[in-house]
Swiss-Prot record:
Sucrose-cleaving enzyme that provides UDP-glucose and fructose for various metabolic pathways. GO terms for molecular function: sucrose synthase activity. Pfam families: Glycos_transf_1 (PF00534), GT-B_Sucrose_synth (PF00862), SUS_EPBD (PF24862), SUS_N (PF24861). It comes from the Eukaryota. Homotetramer or heterotetramer with SUS2. This is Sucrose synthase 1. Its EC number is 2.4.1.13. GO terms for biological process: response to carbon dioxide; sucrose metabolic process. The gene is SUS1. Belongs to the glycosyltransferase 1 family. Plant sucrose synthase subfamily. Expressed in root phloem and leaf mesophyll. Expressed in phloem tissues and aleurone layers of seeds and at lower levels in the pericarp and endosperm cells (at protein level). Predominantly expressed in elongating tissues including roots, developing leaves and internodes. Transmembrane segments: none annotated. It catalyses: an NDP-alpha-D-glucose + D-fructose = a ribonucleoside 5'-diphosphate + sucrose + H(+). Induction: Up-regulated by sucrose, fructose and glucose. Up-regulated under elevated CO2 condition. The lineage of its organism: Eukaryota, Viridiplantae, Streptophyta, Embryophyta, Tracheophyta. It comes from Oryza sativa subsp. japonica.
Length: 816
């Protein structure tokens, strides 16, 4: 149900209970049939599609038309999950993103109850803890800490937090002269390693500041626009102004105008421009502990994929933006960016055992590796991202020491990546008092259905008790949160967002989250990344094409040799290629792609299939990858796909991968991303940037990247036959009309140009750091209560749970 439809339903009746009650009284026979079918499914959880399926089976189409008049179908279609404990059926109803209501229906008595969040969660817990006393359960509720701060209420405001925050700051903090003093103090506090910036001690009041600014403005008006700062810095110092206003007269004048305008008549746009202009970011630390973090020969290793690519592209763009801004601010400061990850002493063939490594394409950015350590010494083995929790506290202390040695100062911004990186970033930012940004990449709770309710079943392998607690701590501690898409935050009209799934949930026997996060919180900002344009560019740019790599690519795709690089063969080289490349894990669902291909003989007639994943020459020690590896072989044998499929080991060479995308374009093929859930979808952006028509999962970020039918296609990984039929339809249409392939290819390229570039990303990130850094400064006391609450959760829950995760047993050194 869309937002407009949701508003229509909400305005029609005042509450869920009244809407359902009205339908019950108007159509009791039909509704009894629906809920009786739900009860007959037996005790357990219901997914949204099950609820709708039973509704469609129970009620004829004619009767469903009648029910629409009573609004019951709208309500039922907005139910995201159900709980059956006879004779009760409880529903979690989501009229629109970020808005939830809970109801319980007694099928025997046709009684309807509206439930509070704790009541609904308590009822849910009965599925796993029948007969236990759950009246005294730890409930986590972060809502009181934010009660005094206004929130936007429209779904379209989600992910545009900085705009709302700017409006709030400009209206509340600057409504009179006294309220502007935090800005004055903020500017006076600016310094870098003892070097004063912006204002010196001569300016102690707002009137003195305004007077100095007007005199500086008058002085600058008599100079040519390109007069360097060095020629008027003495006059500035006499007035109380220090470095940082600009590198020349013109830029200094622009900054002064912004501040004068802000002091005279504050408005959100001027505030954002000013805070984005002043010098605030010189040292950045980016945390990404797990996996194999290096610049070559690691992609495709366990826990090593899009996040590594994202960060390496991110830091190159960030360094360029920092250098540009520092120059424009008239400062002679060398910025530093440190990517902090785990040192792996035995990762042969990679640089993962090297303490410090310069990032290629940068001047001032390095990978800093710090080992995991226990009382027995350095941990040498690779450790799954699900098992890092016992090491992170000691790791954080060691990282703090290493950062201090490298930077000789505190960082100005700490960015966490994924759950483990976000926890370390949170602990460091808390300790150092610096601005903290969170980037989740993927929140595991949404990948594994009901992994909160049945967490004990997952605990031995995944340790979700640690991970979900870590995620709650990090997202509530962060000064601002970056997501690549709206869907990451709040999903869409049909699916729940990653962060939204943390609003309310229960882990029976551990704690109950009645308010974990608010997706309307202005800390959320959508900042979409791009692809590296030097590697990923359109297939049509023939002068840039790396044709010298084509013999290697053709060997990779078509050689008849079976080896550790590639298995199985393609008999017909003239057919287009369906291509996919990802980690070999359950959620990425590459085995699902092979299965849908195997089940559709017509698709096999039309196209070949090439999948790039896993490592034939070095079997993984990751249990999930081992299972998917076996499943892949079994499916290829079951459907007799040899001759139609090529299974290539994970490819580490990004430059060649870029040309591989373009080579697939030459075959008039397509890229398919079949994940059950994908937070963003970097490979989707890469393939579209190369001009390759792309089919990608409807669950997560790709549904936002692709405009369905215009710049690519959405597929449902849970409905493989429909996905394969869509592929057949596309390739049959391309056979009839080759311009159809070109049309979709061009649509993808246009979408990328409009929305997904690293330059736009880095500009936005630097501006966000300025705005939220200022907000952190002026609201520090208000956030103290939240931080104390988080300290308690960390000390009393997380540390206890982390201590139960088994430590790695050191054996023979391993690369994977």
């Amino acid at each position: 149900m869309g937002e407009a439809a949701g508003d229509r339903v909400l305005s029609r009746l005042h509450s869920v209970r009244e809407r359902i009650g009205d339908s019950l009284s108007a159509h009791p026979n039909e509704l009894v049939a629906v809920f009786t079918r739900l009860v007959n499914l037996g005790k357990g959880m219901l997914q949204a599609h099950q609820i709708i399926a039973e509704y469609n089976n129970a009620i004829s189409e004619a009767d469903r038309e009648k029910l629409k008049d009573g609004a019951f179908e709208d309500v039922l279609r907005s139910a995201q999950e159900g709980i059956v404990i006879s004779p009760w059926v409880a529903l979690a109803i989501r009229p629109r993103p970020g808005v939830w209501e809970y109801v319980r229906v007694n099928v025997s008595e046709l009684a309807v109850e509206l439930l509070t969040v704790p009541e609904y969660l308590q009822f849910k817990e009965q599925l796993v803890e029948e007969g236990t006393n759950n009246n005294f359960v730890l409930e986590l509720d972060f809502e009181p800490f934010n009660a005094s701060f206004p929130r936007p209420s429209l779904s379209k405001s989600i992910g545009n937090g900085v705009q709302f925050l700017n409006r709030h700051l400009s209206s509340k903090l600057f409504h009179d002269k006294e309220s502007m003093y935090p800005l004055l103090n903020f500017l006076r506090a600016h310094n870098y390693k003892g070097m004063t910036m912006m204002l010196n001690d001569r300016i102690r009041s707002l009137s003195a500041l305004q007077g100095a600014l007007r005199k500086a403005e008058e002085h600058l008006s008599g100079l040519s626009a390109d007069t360097p700062y060095s020629e008027f810095h003495h006059r500035f110092q006499e007035l109380g102004l220090e470095k940082g206003w600009g590198d020349c007269a013109k830029r200094s004048q622009e900054t002064i105008h912004l501040l004068l305008d802000l002091l005279e008549a504050p408005d959100p746009s001027t505030l954002e421009k000013f805070l984005g202009t002043i010098p605030m970011v010189f040292n950045v630390v980016i945390m990404s502990p797990h996996g194999y973090f290096a610049q070559a020969n690691v992609l495709g290793y366990p826990d090593t994929g899009g996040q590594v690519v994202y960060i390496l592209d991110q830091v190159r763009a960030m360094e360029n933006e920092m250098l540009l801004r520092i120059k424009q601010q008239g400062l002679n400061i060398t910025p530093r960016i440190l990517i902090v990850t785990r040192l792996l002493p035995d990762a042969t063939g990679t640089t993962c055992g090297q303490r410090l490594e310069k990032v290629l394409g940068t001047e001032h950015t390095h990978i800093l590796r710090v080992p995991f350590r226990t009382e027995n010494g350095i941990v040498r083995k690779w450790i799954s991202r699900f098992e890092v929790w016992p090491y992170l506290e000691t790791f954080t202390d060691d990282v703090a020491h290493e950062i201090a040695g490298e930077l000789q100062a505190n960082p100005d911004l700490i960015i966490g990546n994924y759950s483990d990186g976000n926890l370390v970033a949170c602990l460091l930012a808390h300790k150092m008092g610096v601005t903290h940004c969170t980037i989740a990449h993927a929140l595991e709770k949404t990948k594994y259905p009901n992994s909160d309710l049945y967490w004990k079943k997952f605990e031995d392998h995944y340790h979700f008790s640690c991970q979900f607690t870590t995620d709650l701590i990090a997202m509530n501690h962060a000064d601002f949160i970056i997501t690549s898409t709206f869907q990451e935050i709040a999903g869409n009209k049909d699916t729940v967002g990653q962060y939204e799934s943390h609003m309310a949930f229960t882990m029976p026997g551990l704690y109950r989250v009645v308010h974990g996060i608010d997706v309307f919180d202005p800390k959320f900002n959508i900042v979409s990344p791009g692809a590296d344009m030097s590697i990923y560019f359109p297939y049509s740019e023939s002068r840039k094409r790396l044709t010298s790599l084509h013999p290697e690519i053709e060997e990779l795709l078509y050689s008849e040799v079976d080896n550790n690089e590639h298995k199985f063969m393609l008999k017909d080289r003239n057919k287009p290629i369906i291509f996919s490349m990802a980690r070999l894990d359950r959620v990425k669902n590459l085995t699902g792609l092979v299965e849908l291909y195997g089940r559709n003989p017509r698709l096999q007639e039309l196209v070949n299939l090439v999948v790039v994943c896993g490592d034939h020459g070095n079997p993984s020690k990751d249990k999930e990858e081992q299972a998917e590896f076996k499943k892949m072989f079994d499916l290829i044998e079951q459907y007799n796909l040899n001759g139609h499929i090529r299974w290539i080991s994970a490819q580490m060479n990004r430059v060649r991968n870029g040309e591989l995308y373009r080579y697939i374009c030459d075959t008039k093929g397509a890229f398919v991303q079949p994940a059950f859930y994908e937070a963003f979808g970097l490979t989707v952006v890469e393939s579209m940037t190369c001009g390759l028509p792309t089919f990608a999962t409807a669950y997560g970020g790709p549904a936002e990247i692709i405009v369905n039918g215009v710049s690519g296609f959405h597929i449902d990984p849970y409905q493989g036959d429909k996905a394969s039929a869509l592929l057949v339809e596309f390739f049959e249409k391309c056979q009839e009309d080759p311009s159809h392939w070109t049309k979709i290819s061009q649509g993808g390229l246009q979408r990328i140009e409009e929305k997904y570039t690293w330059k736009l990303y880095s500009e936005r990130l630097m501006t966000l750091t300025g705005v939220y850094g200022f907000w952190k400064y002026v609201s520090n006391l208000e956030r103290r209560e939240t931080r104390r609450y988080l300290e308690m959760l960390y000390a009393l829950k997380y540390r206890t749970m982390a201590s139960t995760v088994p430590l790695a047993v050191e054996g023979e050194p391993s690369n994977k």
